[in-house]
Amino acid sequence: MLHTWTALLLLSLGFAQTISPKRPVSTYSIVARDPDTGQLGVAVQSHWFSVGPLVAWAESGVGAVATQSFIDPNYGPLGLELMKAGRTAQEAMDALISTDAGKDVRQVGMIDADGNTAVFTGNSTIPYAGHKMGKNYSVQANLMEKSTVWDAMAHAFESSDGDLAEKLLVALEAAQNEGGDIRGKQSAAILVVSGEATGFPWVDRIFDLRIADHPTPVKELRRLVQLKRAYLKLNEGDEWVTKHQMEKAVSAYEEATSLVEDKQTNGEAPFWVGVTLVEAHQIKESFPYFRRAYRQDESWAELINRLPAAGLLPEDKKLLKQIIKEMKK
């Protein structure tokens, strides 16, 4: 009941205070759910600066929202609040549309934690504009070069493999390959959250990446998603280290190094593989990884001498000297 009254209060206050942009903010987007993991996500690309903060909204265990065209950002937080209060995506959409005097220029996609979808394209949305819903997803687009964009996005999402982030990227790429925004491209964003809330939002946000200004934003977004995958593995390795599970830590770190080139982490990934191998008493095996880190930045050699104070390398001056010597080979 508390959530319901909160949602109604936000609804009455938020829409009354809305100031909408005079130009359309977003062009094409997708909201979706992974039925296997419960993950929820939204991805968008636009010929508009820094599209992510206004368009993409998602909350673990609740749903995801994309609000675009002549955007009213209130659809994001209010839509999530209504779904959290027990409304389906369609019920949340209907409640918001019914109170919006500017609904004819809105375009909104929503999905709830059960995979129910809702989408709305206003009658005055700039063509080509349209949308398509499918099982566990909705795609929506406006200001398109061709009227085939949303069908291309839907087909790409339905036919692609991989996790939710990958499928969202594939949908964006399909839209761009179909011609995309008639104005061009400038920014993109992806937000993927876990299916169940942990109580720690920074843990629940699996991917939260934004390209504010770039000549090929979707391509850059894909690069950052892959880089984030590597850092997720680095984080996993760190967790294993804290549990003194060195073999599992090494495995996670090595997987991180396989996902991206060393230069993309500035040597971070191979360096920590090396450190963990030393902790696991695999000294000789650590040397190639230390060398890889040093090739990216010579500062890694200085860090070797600082780690023993944090308990991350043995207090063994002879060993530390040997590692640094091997790094520089």
Tell where the protein language model's regions lie, with residue ranges:
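Sec-dependent N-terminal signal peptides
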Residues: 3-13
